[in-house]
Amino acid sequence: FVGNFTVKIRRKARFVDETKCTGCGLCTEKCPQKKIPNEFNLGMDNRRAIYIPFAQAVPKVATIDADHCNMLKNGKCGVCSKVCSAGAIDYTQKDTVIEEKYGAIVAATGYNPIELDKFGEFGYAQSKDVVTSLEFERLTNAAGPTSGTLLRPSDGTHPHTIVFVQCVGSRDTSGCGKPYCSKICCMYTAKHAMLVREKYPDTEVYVFYIDVRTPGKNFDEFYRRAVEEYGVNYIKGMVGKVYPEADGTLTVQASDLIENKQIKISADMVVLAAAIEPDKSARPLATMLTASMDTNDFFTEAHPKLRPVESPTAGIFLSGACQGPKDI
């Protein structure tokens, strides 16, 4: 009958007893494995082999990365077990499979920024100071790799000129990118630009855009604040090339469609608003759930107006960006 799903879930071994761990962080502090790229900060800083995945994680319980833990790999170390006063470390844990019956399933696979290897003209692979908007978000976050201080990844200096580039891979019918608008880029770029101007008034900010799309409630007013109150320079035009100079700066070569001319800007950082695409887990999950998808691998709702969060498959519900680009 509808809503009677038997689901098998693989629960990965944490190697830490959740009922005993207090989240004190002493094990992380003492762990000798220090040079593991931090996935949550997109590899811009490092974590330890035992760690709490991110700030404000729920539950606030440490986990051990089996691929990098010396004790789990070769039986040599055990520092975290020695310093844990709660006795929460358990190297004997194994992955377990849980089988339960559920009345409904919610697909919430989210999204990923598009890979930028096809867009070499923006210099992402050539310079550490060309970053994606998500990387820039982490750089400005208090829990990020620089504790919220905006610094250039290449040399740790403060950037005095930042160029934001819109629609990198969005609205692209060439086959390299995505044909659809990613919807959220115009607003988060305006937010980032205002954050920079508010915290660092000496920093010059430029935004290159095709169109500014701000259809939501108070969205256009938000964008106008960036221009009128914060002095963000919006330039309607396309960026043709970004390349590093010998002195460490970046040259942005672009067109200004309003002035009808080619321009060059010397920048300290370039931020790319990368297109949103479905998470790679979406298609395999849809196959398991027998749920329908569109040509872009987003889940399809039963009816856009009458049943906007239901899949055509009874008992399967859709949440967030699994249906398409969305803001919070």
Residue ranges and their predicted role:
Residues F1-I328:
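Residues forming the flavin
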